[in-house]
C-alpha cells in the first residue's frame, strides 16, 4: 500500500528549500545554483545550462494528462535534466513508478513529429526527497539498466534516474559536497558556501513584497479550490467532487493534474484512476 502524507501550504515566512514553491522560485532565478547542484550530485563538470522551453507541450502530452516539471534544463551537450523536489512522502514503489512516468514524458517531448527515436536525447531525472527511499539504505541512488545475465553490460538507452534521500544512510561513497545539501534538506543550518548562498537567496526572496503577494494569492486560490472540492464532494459524491476540484485547480492555478491531486490529498496510488476520469 502506498504511503502518502498530504501537505498543507505553509506561510510565506515558513517556506524552506524543501518546499517546492520556494525551491522552484529560487533555483529558477539562479541557474548557477542548478548547475552547481548537478555538479555535486553527478560529480562531473557541467557546462552551460539553459531552461527547456517546453511547458506548453508537456501540458498537452498524453491527452492533457501531462506534467509540469519543477526544473527542466538542458546543457550544452544536449543532455536534458529534470530536478524535482518531492514534497509528499511516497512509498518506494510509488516514487519509482512516478519516475517511470516522467521518463515517458521526457521521451515523447524530446522528439518532434516524424523524428526517429534514435534522436532521443540523453536524459537524467533527479528526485530530491526529504524522506527515506528503499528503507533508507542510502542517501544517493543512481539507477541505470543493466543485463541481469551479465551486469557488466549496460543498456545504452542513455537514461539515468537518481534519487537523493536526505533521510537515508550516509554511506562511504556519499559525495562529501552532497552532505551539507542533505543536512540543509533536513532543516539544519546551511554549512557550505553553496547552501549558504541558497539560504541567503531564500531570505532575499522573502523580503520581496511582490513575491510574498504572489504566494499569498496562490495560497488563497488553492484554499478556495480545496474548499470547493470538499463542498462539491458532499453534494456530488466524493470522486465526482474531486474530479471537478482537480479541473478547477488546473484552470485557476495552472497546476499540473498531478500537483492538483496532491494538493487535494489524493494518494499517488489513485492518480491513474483520477487521470482516466478527467
Predicted regions located by residue number:
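Conserved single-residue anchors adjacent to enzymatic active/cofactor-binding motifs
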Residues: 1-210
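Short, charged alpha-helical interaction segments and adjacent helix-coil junctions
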Residues: 2-13, 81-86, 174-278
Amino acid at each position: 500500500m502506498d504511503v502518502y502524507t498530504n501537505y498543507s501550504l505553509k506561510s510565506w515566512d515558513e517556506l524552506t528549500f524543501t518546499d517546492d514553491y520556494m525551491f522552484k522560485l529560487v533555483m529558477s532565478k539562479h541557474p548557477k545554483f542548478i548547475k552547481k547542484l548537478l555538479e555535486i550530485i553527478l560529480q562531473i563538470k557541467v557546462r552551460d545550462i539553459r531552461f527547456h522551453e517546453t511547458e506548453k507541450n508537456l501540458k498537452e502530452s498524453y491527452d492533457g494528462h501531462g506534467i509540469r516539471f519543477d526544473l527542466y534544463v538542458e546543457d550544452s551537450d544536449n543532455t536534458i535534466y529534470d530536478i524535482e523536489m518531492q514534497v509528499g512522502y511516497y512509498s518506494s514503489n510509488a516514487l519509482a513508478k512516478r519516475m517511470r512516468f516522467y521518463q515517458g514524458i521526457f521521451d515523447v517531448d524530446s522528439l518532434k513529429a516524424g523524428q526517429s527515436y534514435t534522436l532521443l536525447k540523453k536524459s537524467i531525472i533527479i528526485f530530491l526527497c526529504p524522506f527515506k527511499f528503499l528503507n533508507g539504505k542510502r542517501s544517493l541512488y543512481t539507477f541505470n539498466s543493466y543485463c541481469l545475465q551479465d551486469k557488466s553490460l549496460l543498456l545504452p538507452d542513455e537514461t539515468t534516474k537518481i534519487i537523493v534521500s536526505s533521510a537515508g544512510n550516509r554511506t562511504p561513497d556519499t559525495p562529501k559536497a552532497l552532505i551539507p545539501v542533505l543536512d540543509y534538506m533536513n532543516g539544519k543550518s546551511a554549512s557550505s558556501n553553496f547552501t549558504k548562498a541558497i539560504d541567503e537567496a531564500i531570505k532575499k526572496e522573502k523580503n520581496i513584497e511582490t513575491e510574498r503577494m504572489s504566494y499569498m494569492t496562490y495560497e488563497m486560490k488553492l484554499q478556495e479550490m480545496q474548499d470547493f472540492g470538499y463542498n462539491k464532494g458532499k453534494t456530488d459524491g466524493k470522486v465526482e467532487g474531486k474530479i471537478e476540484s482537480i479541473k478547477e485547480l488546473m484552470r485557476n492555478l495552472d497546476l499540473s493534474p498531478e500537483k492538483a491531486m496532491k494538493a487535494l490529498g489524493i494518494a499517488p496510488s489513485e492518480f491513474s484512476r483520477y487521470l482516466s476520469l478527467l
